[in-house]
From Swiss-Prot:
Transmembrane segments: 26-46, 79-99, 217-237, 266-286
Composition skew (Basic residues), residue ranges: 112-125
InterPro entries assigned to the protein according to its UniProt record, in alphabetical order: Connexin (IPR000500), Connexin_CCC (IPR019570), Connexin_CS (IPR017990), Connexin_N (IPR013092), Connexin_N_sf (IPR038359)
Chief place of localization: membrane
One GO cellular component, as annotated: gap junction
Gene for this chain: GJC2
Family: Belongs to the connexin family. Gamma-type subfamily.
Protein name listed in UniProt: Gap junction gamma-2 protein
Bias (Low complexity): 378-393
Disease: Leukodystrophy, hypomyelinating, 2: An autosomal recessive hypomyelinating leukodystrophy with symptoms of Pelizaeus-Merzbacher disease. Clinically characterized by nystagmus, impaired motor development, ataxia, choreoathetotic movements, dysarthria, and progressive spasticity.
Function (record text): One gap junction consists of a cluster of closely packed pairs of transmembrane channels, the connexons, through which materials of low MW diffuse from one cell to a neighboring cell. May play a role in myelination in central and peripheral nervous systems.
Tissues of expression: Expressed in central nervous system, in sciatic nerve and sural nerve. Also detected in skeletal muscles.
Compositionally biased intervals (Acidic residues): 140-174
Subunit structure: A connexon is composed of a hexamer of connexins. Interacts with TJP1.
Length: 439
């Protein structure tokens, strides 16, 4: 008994702590601290010499052993050890059932998670036809889209990597989903939260362990009552200083003396109190479960609480103003182009703007000529030409690209210069008083 180890039973009881209510955790604390520790530390030290120092006033061989057997049919310490083991047996059986039940639920949830796995890799996106018949394909323009192709390759690589990682972490995800589904939710399993506070009762109900839990509570309470009655019948409420014995082979009634009777009496009363406290905790836990179930039933009959009013619908996103008609892009136009092609597109836009300005200037010149009193005069006698209009009949052509060049430092117009050959060109000249525009 001096080398008795309680580690195995303590580990089992600590595991029960994870599947019990708040009152059950208090009962477990009382059992471990006041019963196991007191019995292992105090009881062993107090009752270690109970038989060695139990002496009788006779020299008859065997009389001392017979009288001690009559005084204590079962040693106090061994009785309390047996009591702890028997009372802990229902809890250990409940723990075994709970672990088995949760393991089966975990396996079922893992299989469901495997069935809910996503399908195979999606097919590559088909090449979309041009939205309008008049718009050519990007290949017809001789333009490449390297960044778009790179993006597709990266997307495929990321998809493959994600699927590989998903296959590697398949079982871990299934176990995590099972833990969440089975009842590992802290807010619903006994931890205080903003929505409410409870002590594990709902978790036991959710795991389907309520009947087994109540059964082990009833068994524990019955064992407590039985051991209280047995302890009273065996030892009473005190350890008497001397014990009269008349059993054979004692020649007559002899008096036997017990060592440290007061200390043993105090310890015996402490064990009575601990047993009564454990019995009271069992009764309180059963009452707690009954009242909690009754409250849940009443709330279920009343119906769910009124839900909060639905939030107001969010306004639609702001509509941004559309781009100008002359600069609008097709819906599938890609802005991801190379730097040289961006410059080319910029020059093309400048040429289009210059051409539009020339057309507007020509139209304004025709209106002025029709309204001028000197209609028959030659063009040279009408004064200097307006800005943006051709200078003379045989003057040099004005390149449309010079509009962009005027904004560039260090560039000057040269009369007679030809348009650049890398972009679309537009110029205008005046022949016979008419304006001709070509691109």
């Amino acid at each position: 008994m001096t080398n008795m180890s309680w580690s195995f039973l303590t580990r089992l009881l600590e595991e029960i702590h994870n599947h019990s209510t708040f009152v059950g955790k208090v009962w477990l604390t009382v059992l471990v601290v006041f019963r196991i520790v007191l019995t292992a530390v105090g009881g062993e030290a107090i009752y270690s010499d109970e038989q060695a120092k139990f002496t009788c006033n006779t020299r008859q061989p065997g009389c001392d052993n017979v009288c001690y057997d009559a005084f204590a049919p079962l040693s106090h310490v061994r009785f309390w050890v047996f009591q702890i083991v028997v009372i802990s047996t229902p809890s250990v059986m409940y723990l075994g059932y709970a672990v088995h039940r949760l393991a089966r639920a975990s396996e079922q949830e893992r299989r469901r998670a495997l069935r809910r796995r996503p399908g195979p890799r999606r097919a590559p996106r088909a090449h979309l036809p041009p939205p309008h018949a008049g718009w050519p394909e990007p290949a017809d323009l001789g333009e490449e889209e390297p960044m778009l192709g790179l993006g597709e390759e990266e997307e495929e690589e990321e998809t493959g990597a994600a699927e590989g990682a998903g296959e590697e972490a398949e079982e871990a995800g299934a176990e995590e989903a099972c833990t969440k589904a089975v009842g590992a939710d802290g807010k619903a399993a006994g931890t205080p939260g903003p929505t409410g506070q409870h002590d594990g009762r709902r978790r036991i109900q959710r795991e389907g362990l309520m009947r087994v839990y109540v059964a082990q509570l009833v068994a524990r309470a019955a064992f407590e009552v039985a051991f209280l009655v047995g302890q009273y019948l065996l030892y009473g409420f005190e350890v008497r200083p001397f014990f009269p014995c008349s059993r054979q082979p004692c020649p007559h009634v002899v008096d036997c003396f017990v060592s440290r009777p007061t200390e043993k009496t105090v310890f015996l009363l402490v064990m009575y109190v601990v047993s009564c406290l454990c019995l009271l905790l069992n009764l309180c836990e059963m009452a707690h479960l009954g009242l909690g179930s009754a409250q849940d039933a009443v709330r279920g009959r009343r119906g769910p609480p009124a839900s909060a009013p639905a939030p107001a619908p969010r306004p639609p996103p702001c509509a941004f103003p559309a781009a100008a008609a002359g600069l609008a892009c097709p819906p599938d136009y890609s802005l991801v182009v190379r730097a040289a092609e961006r410059a080319r597109a910029h020059d093309q836009n400048l040429a289009n703007l210059a051409l539009q300005a020339l057309r507007d200037g020509a139209a304004a010149g025709d209106r002025d000529r029709d309204s001028s009193p000197c209609v028959g005069l030659p063009a040279a006698s009408r004064g200097p030409p307006r800005a943006g209009a051709p200078a003379s009949r045989t003057g040099s052509a004005t390149s449309a690209g010079t509009v962009g060049e005027q904004g560039r430092p260090g560039t000057h117009e040269r009369p007679g210069a030809k348009p650049r050959a890398g972009s679309e060109k537009g110029s205008a000249s005046s022949r016979d008083g008419k304006t001709t525009v070509w691109i």
